[in-house]
Amino acid sequence: ESLEVSTGRFKGVPLTAELFARAREEDPDAYVIAHVMNPEEVDLCLLHKDSAIASDAVLRGDEGHPRAAGTFPRGIGILRKAGLSWPEAVRHATSRPAEMIWHRGGRIIEGANAELVVIDPDSYEDRGRFGAPLTAPGGVKWVVLNGVIVVEGGEIVGPSSGRILLGE
């Protein structure tokens, strides 16, 4: 009961040995979600001063894990609830992950990529759910990627101009 098919023909069905064999035959590209993380342990790990908010979520079209869209508001919310200031909590989702892959990003400094997210702190929240993993987080007002406005007034207005970051 801790494994669930998250995409394709058997989406939402608990994975059994029988279903696994059938899915490999009939829907070999289906993804599976393992519901094995203990929320209290995740929260405890996030509170470490060197933790980074990141996700391994994989999407297939509009199917997959809700952390695909909700990782950052959920993680920042956990840190804020634990008493971290906004700058401290945001650092766990910006400059800290960048430092971990030896990347210059995640900071507002001269020479860095123009990547900014403007949020309403009172309504910034994870809204993603199983069955609707791409539900946009609440409270995201503006997003600028590589100098291009892609979210304005909470609405997507341009194509993504982001790129995959690899350790340098």
Protein language model regions, located:
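Active-site neighborhoods of metal-dependent hydrolases
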Residues: E1-G83
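Glycine-centered flexibility motif
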Residues: G12, A69-G70, G106, R129, ...
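Structural signal for hydrophobic packing residues in well-ordered secondary-structure cores
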Residues: R24, R80, T94-P97, I101
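Acidic, glycine-enriched loop/beta-strand segments at the rims
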Residues: V32-V36, V42, S85-E88, A98-L134
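C-terminal cap of metal-dependent C-N hydrolases
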Residues: D43-D50, S55-D56, A114-R163
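N-terminal alpha-helical segment
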Residues: F72, V90-T94
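Acidic/polar loop patches that form or flank catalytic/metal-binding clefts of enzymes
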Residues: W86-R91, V151-E152
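Short, solvent-exposed cationic patches
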Residues: L165-E168
